[in-house]
Structure formats: structure tokens, C-alpha cells
Amino acid sequence: MYPFVSNHPTTHTSYSTMPGFSGLDDKSCSSRYTDSVMNSYPPMGVPGSASIAQFYQQAAAVSAASAGVGVDSLGSACSQLSSSVGGAQSGLPDITRHPWLVTASQSALQKFASTDWMSNPFDRVVCGDFAGPNGCPRRRGRQTYTRFQTLELEKEFHFNHYLTRRRRIEIAHALCLTERQIKIWFQNRRMKLKKELRAVKEINEQARREREEQDKMKNESLKSAQQHHSQKQAQQEHTVVGSQQTSNGGGTGGGTGGSGGAGSGGSSGNLGSHLHHPSIVSQNDLKLGLGGMGVGVGGNLSMMGAQT
């Protein structure tokens, strides 16, 4: 623990010129009291309980004397305190005072006194030297380009997406801009082009997927139509075959009936005179029918020969 060093000068008031204060002397009382109090601290490691008790007793006596009404009692208490402390000072060892400690403490106190420690440290450190609305740093405004500058930069970007240092200096001088502004504009323009190409690629990809889906749906509809047409054609063929089969069966039955009718026509005249067993009758009818057919054929041939 280091001794307390006061940087404030002690104010000495001359009480000799005022009536009633003849017993007080600034040099004999105040200066000796200050020196004795500063030297009354015990060294480190040495408890010094007797000196501490004596110091507190003397401080209590001074406070009681200052609270009293009489000024002479204050002067006597001050003189008694100085004499007692002066006697006790001879028994205490001297405290070593290093000059760099005193200098460091004084510089620290001066720095603390000169600093406005009640203000906000954030405002003092971060926002102290800027002219923002609330003391905070103002954001830098966005660079605006004229129509002519934008047109020239777009023409240059159309031919070259990247500029050399020499070409950048030429454009900067021609358009009254800085190299940094030209560089930043080209960087932003390249990013814009990249985004545009990405958007076009996404649009083309989406259109391709939609076209593939439409082609797939069209192929499926064609396949279903072909299957339906093939099924319908098979049904039509089946109905045609069935109708042909039915027509063939009807013609065969009609031919058999016609031959039977011819035989019965030829033998109709003999049915009344020949009454026999049914089987015999049918055989006779067949014979007669065949005979009638032969007669008819022969008659036709004879008629053709007569005509010729």
C-alpha cells in the first residue's frame, strides 16, 4: 500500500490579522499537521497498532475542537496535536518514496481530471469525430453517373469486360471520374451480367422441362389413340368374319332345299299312285328327281340344236 500523495495545494489563511485568532499560526499548525498525518502511516508489513490508535484519538480531538464554540480551544488543540505528533514522529521509520511512482500518480490524476469520464465512452471513442445526425458516422452517399458517362461505360463494357490500368486511366480522364469509380462500376456491371445470364439459363431450363413434359404427354396420347384404333379395327374384323360365316351357312341350306324341291316337283304326279314305305318313297323321289333333271337338261340341249 502506497502513501497518499495530495496534488491539491494546501490553502493557508492568515488568522493573525483577524481579531480573536491570535493563537493560530498557519506555519506552526497547518503545515506541521499535514506533514505529521502523511508520515504517520506505518510501513508495509509492520502493524503499528499503537500509532494507528494514537492517530484516531488525535483526529477525534480535532473534530471535537472544531465543533466547539471557542476558537482558543481550537488553537490549543492544534498546538497539542502538533506537539504530540512531532514527538511520535521520531520513533517511526522513514517511508521510501520513489520518484517515478509520484510522477506516475500525478500524470494519472491529471489525465483523469482532463477526461470527461461522465460522458458516454462509445460517443467519445466511436462517434466523436464524425458529423452524423446523432454523432455517429454518416454513411457515404452512392455515386451517381450521368447519362453520357453511363453510355460510354456501357459501350466500353460491350467490347471489354475487364480493363487494363492504362485503359482505365484513359476512361477516367475522359469521363472526369476516378480510377476507383471506374473499377467499381465494371465490377458491378460484371455481377449484373452474371445475374442476367443466370436468369436466362433458368428460364431456358424451365422452358426445356415444360417442352419435355408436353412431348411426353403428346406421346402418351398418341399411344393411347393407337391402342384404341387397333382395338376398334380388331372388333370390326371380328364382326366381318362372323357375318361371312353366317352368310355361308344360309347359302348351303338354301341349295339343299332347292334340290329337294326339284325332286318333289318331279315326283308330285306319282305320289297318289305310289303309296309305299317312307324310305322307299324317298328313294323313288330322289330317282325321279334326278330323272326329271336329266330330262330337263336333254330338252334344253335339243332346243339349242334346233335353233342353230
From Swiss-Prot:
Q: Name one GO cellular component term.
A: nucleus
| Keyword Manganese part of the UniProt annotation | no
Principal localisation: nucleus
Compartments where found: Nucleus
Q: Has keyword tRNA-binding? A: no
| Gene3D superfamilies per record | Homeodomain-like
Ranges of compositional bias, category Gly residues: 248-269
Q: What is the similarity comment for this entry? A: Belongs to the Antp homeobox family.
**Name assigned to this protein:** Homeobox protein abdominal-A homolog
**From what organism does this protein derive?**
Anopheles gambiae
Name the gene. Answer: abd-A
